[in-house]
Amino acid sequence: MRKIGIIGFGRIGRIHFKSVKKINDTEVIAVADPFADQMTEVFAKFGIDNYSNDFNEIINNPEIDTVFICSPTDTHAEIAIAAAKAGKDIFCEKPID
């Protein structure tokens, strides 16, 4: 089973979350968003129990093998590099600045 972490849970992060839920043999393990503390109702609506405001918790989680980077454009490169160094498979929204 492919275990996924989503970084950034705005509009596009939510779209990817819904898409991943439809794929057999995949599971979203955790979500990170810098505004996570203010999004508890949103996470409850989507059935997300494991969330953080620190993307490093996704990167450093040994259960997660794939990271979806759905954060603002200016954060893509930093997060993608950290995910690659951690040996994660990466799906990154464009562009990468």
Locate the predicted segments by residue.
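N-terminal Rossmann-like dinucleotide-binding module
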Residues: 1-46
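Beta-loop-alpha module in the N-terminal Rossmann-like domain of NAD(P)-dependent dehydrogenases
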Residues: 46-97
